[in-house]
């Protein structure tokens, strides 16, 4: 190549470089089109499968009036917040679904929009509450909390979630958009080619690392009200806290994911039997790590922490962490550095009237 460069006139060298650059751009464009075509095909196949099931459901006669066993009539919704180890946790559910006999379904919204239209909310609620073929069901997707009670549903689904330190979550998302992860390393990401570090972005006041980008975990728990997505809304944070306490079965934290899995296995063995052992001793195929991630400097962190938005998101995170640790403290005991689930700690007595 070096010899050709010497022999080739400067103009031809320039043309060769330009031709190579054009060829690379064309190749990247074709790869992007192939990825988009693959995604469209996957969606079409998924819709076809759903239609087939619905057709069988119609031919066999409606089953929504059929009585399901209480253990089977369960729906879990994991409305996962991006970059909180959600894929790692979801893959555990996929690994266990055949063994534990339940279904896992991904809720794929257009452009990952976490807010559904009113008509889609109605469809979604009706779909998963009457789709008995998919029960017990574990649904997961990047959607904000949806209150099933306001749609007149008799039996609400079980909500679970995981949240993360807000700055760590934003840093992970920033690099994910540029470099992807080790789960699908060949997939082209939206910001691929941008080599700017998170520190440089914050120093320059870039939009991808602005404090407003921290506002995500609160609206995901707050829900579908317009005020939930009003950045910095105190009402939204209060509503998110209320939902976390009153509407969520369990909310864990990324930093203590194993303990979250252990508590789920103890409380909901129908879905999570074997999950703790899989997490501890499995091949870790479910784990996912963002590529090329660089930890921010203390100066960068300090600058973000001056924002009122960070203060609110961090307050919500600390609130969730305190609640999770409270639940864990009453469910496990520690021995030799390891945690063990407590046995049943209540019983019934003085039962009247006495049976003959």
UniProtKB/Swiss-Prot annotation:
The active site is at residues 140, 142. GO terms for biological process: gene expression; heparan sulfate proteoglycan biosynthetic process; heparin proteoglycan metabolic process; ureteric bud formation. The keyword Amino-acid biosynthesis does not apply. Disulfide bonds join 201-209, 222-228. One of its GO terms (molecular function) is heparan sulfate 2-sulfotransferase activity. It is found in: Golgi apparatus membrane. Its EC number is 2.8.2.-. Keywords: Coiled coil, Disulfide bond, Glycoprotein, Golgi apparatus, Membrane, Signal-anchor, Transferase, Transmembrane, Transmembrane helix. Widely expressed. Expressed at higher level in lung and brain. Weakly expressed in spleen. Pfam families: Sulfotransfer_2. It is a single-pass type II membrane protein. Glycans are attached at residues 108, 127. Residues 24-51 form a coiled coil. It is an enzyme of class 2 (transferase). Its main location: Golgi. One of its GO terms (cellular component) is Golgi membrane. Residues 29-356 are lumenal. Adenosine 3',5'-bisphosphate binds at residues 83-88, 164, 172, 279, 285, 290, 293. Belongs to the sulfotransferase 3 family. Catalyzes the transfer of a sulfo group from 3'-phospho-5'-adenylyl sulfate (PAPS) to the 2-OH position of iduronic acid (IdoA) or glucuronic acid (GlcA) within the heparan sulfate (HS) chain and participates in HS biosynthesis. Required for metanephric development of kidney formation, suggesting that 2-O-sulfation within HS is essential for signaling between ureteric bud and metanephric mesenchyme. This is Heparan sulfate 2-O-sulfotransferase 1. It comes from Mus musculus (Mouse).
């Amino acid at each position: 190549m070096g010899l050709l460069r010497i022999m080739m006139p400067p103009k031809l060298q320039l043309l060769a470089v330009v031709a190579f650059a054009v060829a690379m751009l064309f190749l990247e464009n074709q790869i992007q089109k192939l990825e988009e075509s693959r995604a469209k095909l996957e969606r079409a196949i998924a819709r076809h499968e759903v239609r087939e099931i619905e057709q069988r459901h119609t031919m066999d006669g409606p089953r929504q009036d059929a009585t399901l066993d209480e253990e089977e009539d369960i729906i879990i919704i994991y409305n996962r917040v991006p970059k909180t180890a959600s894929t790692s946790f979801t893959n555990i559910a996929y690994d266990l679904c055949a063994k534990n006999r339940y279904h896992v379904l991904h809720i794929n919204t257009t452009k990952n929009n976490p807010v559904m239209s009113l008509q889609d909310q109605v469809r979604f609620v009706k779909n998963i509450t009457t789709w008995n073929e998919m029960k017990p069901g574990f649904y997961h997707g990047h959607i904000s909390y949806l209150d099933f009670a306001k749609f007149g549903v008799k039996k609400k689904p079980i909500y679970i979630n995981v949240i993360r330190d807000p700055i760590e979550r934003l840093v992970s998302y920033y690099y994910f958009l540029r470099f992807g992860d080790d789960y699908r390393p060949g997939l082209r990401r939206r910001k691929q080619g941008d080599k700017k570090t998170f520190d440089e972005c914050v120093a320059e006041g870039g939009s991808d690392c602005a404090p407003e980008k921290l506002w995500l975990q609160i609206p995901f728990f707050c829900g579908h009200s317009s005020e939930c997505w009003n950045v910095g809304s105190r009402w939204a944070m209060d509503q998110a806290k209320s939902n976390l306490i009153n509407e969520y079965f369990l909310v864990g934290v990324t930093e203590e994911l194993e303990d979250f899995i252990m508590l789920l296995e103890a409380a909901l063995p129908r879905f999570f039997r074997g999950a703790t052992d899989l997490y501890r001793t499995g091949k870790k195929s479910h784990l996912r790590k963002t590529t090329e991630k660089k930890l921010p400097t203390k100066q960068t962190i300090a600058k973000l922490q001056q924002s009122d938005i960070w203060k609110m998101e961090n307050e919500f995170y600390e609130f969730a962490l305190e609640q999770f640790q409270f639940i864990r403290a009453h469910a496990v005991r520690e021995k030799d550095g390891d945690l063990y689930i407590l046995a049943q700690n209540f019983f019934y007595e003085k039962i009247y009237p006495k049976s003959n």
